[in-house]
Amino acid sequence: MSKRTYQPSKVRRNRAHGFRKRNATKGGRDVLKRRRAKGRKRLVVSAPKK
């Protein structure tokens, strides 16, 4: 039996899929642009503010 592959970590999730990571590349900025155009409430996955 192999272990589950999803081992959640807020830090790792934000580093991989956060706003700064998206903004760092042309493709990522395109993603943000599309999500803004679509009217997404949340542009990126990120830990909710406390």
Curated annotation (Swiss-Prot):
Ranges of Basic residues composition bias in the record: 10-24, 32-50
CC per GO annotation: ribonucleoprotein complex; ribosome
Keywords for this protein: Ribonucleoprotein, Ribosomal protein
Keyword match Ribosomal protein: yes
Gene3D superfamilies: 1.10.287.3980
InterPro entries: Ribosomal_bL34 (IPR000271), Ribosomal_bL34_CS (IPR020939)
Pfam families: Ribosomal_L34
Any one GO MF annotation of this record: structural constituent of ribosome
GO biological process, one term: translation
Organism superkingdom: Bacteria
Family: Belongs to the bacterial ribosomal protein bL34 family.
Descriptive protein name: Large ribosomal subunit protein bL34
